[in-house]
Each structure stands twice: as structure tokens, then as C-alpha cells.
């Protein structure tokens, strides 16, 4: 049964560079352009095509031992090699000498860091996966999404355990690079394909001063060795002071760079993320339906999106459920703060409606509801979300599956 077929019942009621903080580093980190950079060599300007050819020739004549990256031979002369070389050229405005220098340093770093084998290592940060930095799903354009959230480090014990000394810090840096390497492996590296990731950074409870050293090292590593790999940076739960800092830096950023920053104030994470990412790919803590264990069951089941206006109640009716069938559903409203309930209404007129979930006031921090119900007779399930006490419009999503009874008489 297709969830999208269910009807809705709407009821209105300068040169010297100062020491950068984590925030300023995030703002000034360069990103590429999803729409413009398709990597078709035929679409490059003649001067850019010439720069690409010169870089190939200089790299071939270079003394650099390593000439492959992410499993792609840079001297192979194929489309994948061109995509990677163009990333380094764009990072240095197509200046061949600067691009070659950057590329050679990156190749040396990858060899010393053993980056090619990094994704297979167990670095002992299982408890941070899915919390601090992790790849989860794709955006609506097919870009892998990397989530970052450093709020857990506001607790001194956690901070000391991860960043307590230089050895611990270096191990964390290696793990953070590992997360990005896993994201890079999800890219196509071909003209017209998906050649960059989306980065979502949650600024809630982020300890700014304490993370300065670690964050600056991470961002330096990424900027030096992963050029043009981040297409869009989405900042969620943005505190007021971040917006002030951004407004100060904004005049010095190019329009192209500014177009790739998305700022979302506290409480608007779901509303912002729904514009770029499908709800089944958004983590439950941000108003989506994705849980860490979902990937074990294959691709996520698509969800249907809807919105609830302020002063409105919405009833989602899932009809055509046979007797003895089991219906399982997920439903979420971004920043809930409203009342939710569920009931089953039999088709037979003499039967009574069954309360499946009593009306419950959902808190703003509540995650998606997942529940199931086995019917005795045919009927429909009604999921109700009551936003009549709020003036704020909210985004929401739901999905369901119906499993028919296998019992035979």
C-alpha cells in the first residue's frame, strides 16, 4: 500500500591573520558550487582546458612517487582523474604551479597518513559514531550527507577522554578524517555525477574555546587535502552570536561562496533540512525518520511529507486495511510541541473506534513515533496531529507498511 495515496483531512482552527575560532574557521572554509562545477572538460574555458593539460604534464614529470588518490590513478587520463585534478585547479583558481604544489603535498600527506587504508581501521570511537561525526543518507540531489555535532564535548569528562593529551587528539583527528574518507568513497568522480558532499553542522551546546585547537586542525587538514569536496554547508541550531560573526565576514565572501552557506536558527533544524534532504534520510534527532540501525535493512522506505499550519489539526487517514493485518508506521513533526494521537476506525457501522494511542502532548525534543497495530476487522487508521494552540507552521512526515495476515482457516 502506497503511503502517498492517503488523503489528509485539514481542519483549520587584513594580511595579518588572527587566531581563528572554530566558528570563523567554518565560515571561511571554501566550498564549491553544485550547479556550476559539472566537470565536463568540454565545458571548460580554453584557458582552463590548457591549465588542466599543463597540470597533467607537470604531474607526469614530477618526482612524486604516489600518483593515485581514492583509488583513482591521476595519470590514467580518464574522466575520474580529470575530476580530481580539476578540484585542485579550482582550489587554486587554475594556477597550475600552485595547484601542482597543493596536489603533491596532498599525495605526500596521504602516503604518510596511510589514508587509503584508513576506512578499515578500528580507532575505538564507536561511541562517537552517529553522534559527533557520521555519514548518513543523501540529499535530494544525491550528495552524501556528513553530520557534525560537538555538543557532547561540553561535558568535561568526555572532553578529557577524547582531547586530554596530544596522543588522544591525534587519534581523534585520524578518526575524523576516517569519517570523511568514508564519505568520499560514496562519490562518483565523473562529469555530471555526484562529486561532493553536503555538510550539516549542529552548533547546539558547542564548546567554542575548548575545541579551538582540535577544530582548527581538522579544518586545516580538510582544506589542504580535500579541495572542492563540500558542496553546501548547512548550519543548524545557530546561536545569535554566530549570526553576528557571519554578518561581519559576509561582505568579504564571494557571492558564489555565500550561496553555499545555509544558516538555521535554533528550533528550525527540521524546517531547514527538509528543503535539502528527504525526511527518511534525516536523523531522528533533527526531525527526520532515520535511525542508526536503519542501514542494516537496506535503503530507507520513502516517506510522505506534509505541513501543519498554525491553528490547524491534520488527520492522516490510512484506509483499506484488512482484518488481521498488521500496520506499522512512523510519524514525526519538526519541533513537535503539539498533540498527537492515533485511532483505528472499523468499516462496520456497529463497531466502535479503537484508541491506539491516547492524545499525548509531544515535546519539542521528542523524536519520531514508531508503532504498530494488528487489526481484528477491516477499517482505517487515523493519525492526528493537533497544532491548534500554536501559530507556527511545521513540517512533518510519515510512512507506513501493511502486512496482511497469513493465517488460514
From Swiss-Prot:
It holds the Pfam family CRAL_TRIO. One of its GO terms (cellular component) is plasma membrane. Residues 116-294 form the CRAL-TRIO domain. Keywords: Cell cycle, Cell division, Coiled coil, Cytoplasm, Lipid-binding, Membrane, Transport. Coiled coil: none annotated. It is a peripheral membrane protein. It comes from Arabidopsis thaliana (Mouse-ear cress). GO terms for biological process: cell division; cellular response to auxin stimulus; protein localization involved in auxin polar transport. 'Patella' means 'small plate' in Latin. It comes from the Eukaryota. The gene is PATL6. InterPro entries: CRAL-TRIO_dom (IPR001251), CRAL-TRIO_dom_sf (IPR036865), CRAL/TRIO_N_dom (IPR011074), CRAL/TRIO_N_dom_sf (IPR036273), GOLD_dom (IPR009038), GOLD_dom_sf (IPR036598), PATL (IPR044834), PATL1-6_C_GOLD (IPR056794). GO terms for molecular function: lipid binding. This is Patellin-6. Carrier protein that may be involved in membrane-trafficking events associated with cell-plate formation during cytokinesis. Binds to some hydrophobic molecules such as phosphoinositides and promotes their transfer between the different cellular sites. It is found in: Membrane; Cytoplasm. The keyword Coiled coil applies. Residues 270-404 form the GOLD domain. Belongs to the patellin family.
